Curated annotation (Swiss-Prot):
Full protein name: Exoribonuclease 2
A GO MF term: RNA binding
Keyword Hydrolase set for record: yes
Organism encoding this protein: Sodalis glossinidius (strain morsitans)
Its biological purpose: Involved in mRNA degradation. Hydrolyzes single-stranded polyribonucleotides processively in the 3' to 5' direction.
Encoding gene, per UniProt annotation: rnb
Reaction equations catalysed: Exonucleolytic cleavage in the 3'- to 5'-direction to yield nucleoside 5'-phosphates
Lineage, top ranks: Bacteria, Pseudomonadati, Pseudomonadota, Gammaproteobacteria, Enterobacterales
Subcellular location: Cytoplasm
S1 motif domain residues: 562-644
Keyword Hydrolase attached: yes
EC number(s) reported in the record: 3.1.13.1
Chief localisation class: cytoplasm
Length: 644
C-alpha cells in the first residue's frame, strides 16, 4: 500500500535532509571503537559495530545522532579510502588467504587472493603488496583486497629494506647499463689537468666519488681552488633512455647498509667516479679565495681531464690534522693539499660565521650490520674537521655556480629558503619578546635580519628558543629562478657537486656546460622541481622507516631493563614527549602518564614547548634527561621510554 506513495517518499527525503551530517577522517584505536575527526577541535565517537564498516584514515560522511546525551557518528558514505595500495602480511587458514595491513592502527584481517598473473604460493607471514577492491561503505558486504605482488618471504632477515622500498614504491636495485653507452664529446676540448695533485676525501667505503679538489697558493696569501666534479652528462645525453631513468629516480637512495644508485653502477661507481690514479672526465670550477674568506669575481667553469692522486678517508685526514693515530699521507704533495684545504676551510668558515650562517655540527649514526641484516652495533660518527673541509669547498663551488647561472642565464635549479613565513612572523616575534629578544618583524623577513637572529639563537645555552620558532619558518625548496637561501645565509645557492647522486645537479651541469659552448641550455620546468621534491620526500621516509625497524630490533633486548640512555627532548605534544637517544640516534616516545601519573596535574603543551607538573615547569624542548626503555613494539617499530 505504501510502496509508491509520493507522500511517504517526500517524508523520507525530508527526514534525510534534516538529519545532521558531517565529513571527517576516521581515527582508529586499539580498543575497537574510533572517532570521526571533523577538525582540530571537533570529533565524534564511532562505536565498535560501525568501526567494522570503516578503516582508520578513511575520509567519510556520517550521520550524527545523540544517544544518552552523547553525539555519535554513524558512517554513511565513503569519500576517500585510506587504503588503496598497501603492504601487508599474509595469513593462510583452511587454504583461504587473508592480508593484514602493516599499519599500527589497522588490524583488519582482509580476505584476499592473488590477482591474475601472480603465481607464487603464499604462506603465513609472507609480505605482499595488495590493492583494495571492495569496501562496506561502497555497498560491498565486506572488505576485500587483491594481492598484486610478493614482497618477500616471512623468514627474510632483510624484510625491513624490501618492505619499506615496496611501501614507498621505490626501486630495489640499480638500473641496468644499456648497450652502446659511450663518452659524448662536443664543444671545446677538455683541459688536461692530470698532472695536478687532486685529492678526494670521503667515507672509507664510498665508491661513487663525485668531487676532487686541488689548491695552489696565490699572491697576497690567497688560494686558487679548483673543484673538479664527475661528469655523468658526458655519458648520459639529455632525453636518452638513461636520462629518463635518472630523472625518474631523481636521487641515489641511501639506506642503512647499502645504496640504490640513480645511475647504473658501471657509471656511478666506476666510469664517472673520480677514482684514485684513474683518468676521468670532469666539469671544473676554478676560483680565487682571498685570505679573509671572500671569493674573487673570477670563477671560471670548464671541462677537463683529471686524475685523483689519492682517495682519502674523513677519519684518517682528521686524525692526521689533529695529530692522532698512525695514518700518514702517501706523498708530501698530498700532505700539502690537505694543509692548503684546511687553511681555506678555516678562512671560508670564519667568513660564513660572520657574514652568512654555519649549521651546527650534528653527528651521523651508522648501523653496523652483519650478513643477515641484523644490527651488531650503532656507531656515532661526529662531523670532524675533514668533513667541514669538504663542506666548505662544496659550498664555495655551489655559490660560484649560483652566480654564474644567475648572471649568464637567469635560471637554473636553485635551492631557496625564504626564512620566516610572513603570515607567521608576528608569532615568532612575540615568543622572542617573551624571552627578552627584541626584533622587528620586517627585519626578520630580510636575509640580514634573519642571519642576525640566527647568530643570537646559536649563542643561547640550549636549543629551546630555536626549536620554538622553527615552526614559523618556510620549508626549503627547489626553484627554477634565483632566490636567497636564508638557512645558509646566502643570496643564491645552486648545487652541481653531486651529479652522480642527484638529477638536479645533472641539470645544472648541462646549463653550466651550455654557457661554455658544450650543448644547449634548456630551461628546467616546474614538473622537474615537483618530481625532485616528491622523490626526496619518498627517499627520506624510506630511510626513516628502515632506521625505525633496525632501531627496534637493536633496542628490543634492552626493553624492560635498567639500562640508562641520555636523551634530548625533540618534541612535546598533548600525549607526551618525543626524545632522541644521544648515543645511537633512536627516537623514542615518553607517554604523559610516565611523566606524572595524575593527569589533571600535568600539562604537556606543544604551544610553549614545555611540560608542567602542578604548575611548575619540569621539562622543556631541548632539555636532556636520562631514560630507560619500557617497551619496544615490533609491530609498529616504536620505542617507548620512561624518565629515570
Amino acid at each position: 500500500m505504501f510502496q509508491d506513495n509520493p507522500l511517504l517518499a517526500q517524508l523520507k527525503q525530508q527526514l534525510h535532509s534534516q538529519t545532521p551530517r558531517v565529513e571527517g577522517v576516521v581515527k582508529g584505536t586499539e580498543k575497537g571503537f574510533g572517532f570521526l575527526e571533523v577538525d582540530a577541535q571537533k570529533s565524534y565517537f564511532i562505536s565498535p559495530p560501525f568501526m567494522k564498516k570503516v578503516m582508520h584514515g578513511d575520509k567519510i560522511s556520517a550521520v550524527v545522532r545523540t544517544e544518552k546525551e552523547r553525539e555519535i557518528a554513524e558512517p554513511e558514505e565513503l569519500i576517500e579510502p585510506f587504503l588503496t595500495r598497501f603492504i601487508g602480511r599474509v595469513q593462510v587458514k583452511d587454504e583461504r588467504l587473508a592480508v593484514v595491513p602493516d599499519h599500527p592502527l589497522i588490524k583488519e584481517v582482509i580476505p584476499t587472493r592473488p590477482q591474475h598473473g601472480v603465481d607464487q604460493m603464499f604462506q603465513t607471514g609472507d609480505w605482499a603488496v595488495a590493492e583494495m577492491r571492495r569496501h562496506p561503505l561502497k555497498g560491498d558486504r565486506q572488505f576485500y583486497a587483491e594481492i598484486t605482488a610478493l614482497v618477500t618471504r616471512a623468514d627474510d632477515h632483510f624484510a625491513p629494506w624490501w618492505v619499506t622500498l615496496a611501501r614507498h614504491n621505490l626501486e630495489r636495485a640499480a638500473p641496468t647499463m644499456p648497450e652502446g653507452v659511450s663518452l659524448q664529446e662536443d664543444g671545446p676540448a677538455r683541459e688536461d689537468l692530470t698532472a695536478l695533485d687532486f685529492i678526494t676525501i670521503d667515507s672509507a667505503s664510498t665508491e661513487d666519488m663525485d668531487d676532487a679538489i686541488h689548491l695552489a697558493p696565490a699572491p697576497n696569501g690567497a688560494w686558487v681552488m679548483t673543484v673538479a666534479i664527475a661528469d655523468p652528462t658526458a655519458w648520459v645525453p639529455a632525453g636518452s633512455p638513461l636520462d629518463n631513468i635518472a630523472r625518474e629516480r631523481a636521487f641515489t637512495n641511501y639506506l642503512p647498509g647499502f645504496n640504490i644508485p640513480m645511475l647504473p653502477r658501471a657509471l656511478s661507481d666506476d666510469l664517472c667516479s673520480l677514482r684514485a690514479h684513474e683518468r676521468r672526465p670532469a666539469l671544473a670550477c676554478r676560483v680565487t679565495v682571498r685570505p679573509n674568506g671572500t671569493l674573487a669575481d673570477d670563477a671560471r667553469f670548464f671541462t677537463a681531464w683529471i686524475e685523483s692522486k689519492g682517495k682519502l678517508a674523513y677519519d684518517n685526514v682528521s686524525d692526521w690534522l689533529e695529530n692522532l693515530g698512525s695514518w700518514q699521507p702517501e706523498t708530501e704533495a698530498i700532505a700539502d693539499q690537505i694543509r692548503l684545504l684546511h687553511d681555506v676551510c678555516l678562512a671560508r668558515s670564519a667568513w660564513r660565521q660572520r657574514h652568512a650562517l654555519v649549521f651546527k655540527d650534528r653527528p651521523d649514526y651508522r648501523f653496523v650490520l652483519n650478513e643477515k641484516g641484523n644490527v651488531d652495533d650503532i656507531v656515532v660518527e661526529p662531523r670532524r674537521i675533514a668533513n667541514r673541509m669538504i663542506e666548505e669547498a662544496m659550498i664555495t663551488a655551489n655559490v660560484c655556480a649560483a652566480r654564474v647561472l644567475r648572471d649568464g642565464l637567469g635560471y637554473g635549479l636553485y635551492n631557496v629558503h625564504h626564512g620566516f613565513d610572513p603570515l607567521l612572523v608576528d608569532q615568532a616575534v612575540a615568543i622572542l619578546h617573551s624571552h627578552q629578544i627584541e626584533v622587528d618583524p620586517a627585519d626578520l623577513l630580510t636575509l640580514e635580519g634573519f642571519c642576525a637572529l640566527r647568530r643570537r639563537l646559536d649563542a643561547q645555552p640550549t636549543s629551546y628558543l630555536d626549536s620554538r620558532i622553527r615552526r614559523f619558518q618556510t620549508f626549503a625548496e627547489v626553484s627554477t629562478v634565483p632566490g636567497p637561501h636564508f638557512g645558509l645565509g646566502l643570496d643564491a645557492y645552486a648545487t652541481w657537486t653531486s651529479p652522480i647522486r642527484k638529477y638536479g645537479d645533472m641539470i645544472n651541469h648541462r646549463l653550466l656546460k651550455a654557457l661554455i659552448g658544450v650543448g644547449d641550455a634548456e630551461r628546467p620546468n616546474e614538473e622537474v622541481t615537483l618530481r625532485l621534491a616528491e622523490r626526496r620526500r619518498q627517499n627520506r621516509m624510506a630511510e626513516r622507516d628502515v632506521g625505525d625497524w633496525l632501531y627496534a630490533r637493536f633496542l628490543q633486548p634492552k626493553a624492560g631493563s635498567d639500562s640508562r640512555f641520555a636523551a634530548e627532548i625533540i618534541d612535546i605534544s598533548r600525549g607526551g614527549m618525543r626524545v632522541r637517544l644521544l648515543n645511537n640516534g633512536a627516537v623514542a616516545f615518553i607517554p604523559a602518564p610516565f611523566i606524572h601519573s595524575v593527569r589533571d596535574e600535568l600539562v604537556c603543551s606543544q604551544d610553549t614547548g614545555t611540560v608542567q607538573v602542578k604548575g611548575e615547569e619540569r621539562y622543556r624542548q631541548g632539555d636532556t634527561l636520562d631514560v630507560t626503555l619500557a617497551e619496544v613494539r615490533m609491530e609498529n617499530r616504536s620505542v617507548i621510554a620512561r624518565p629515570v
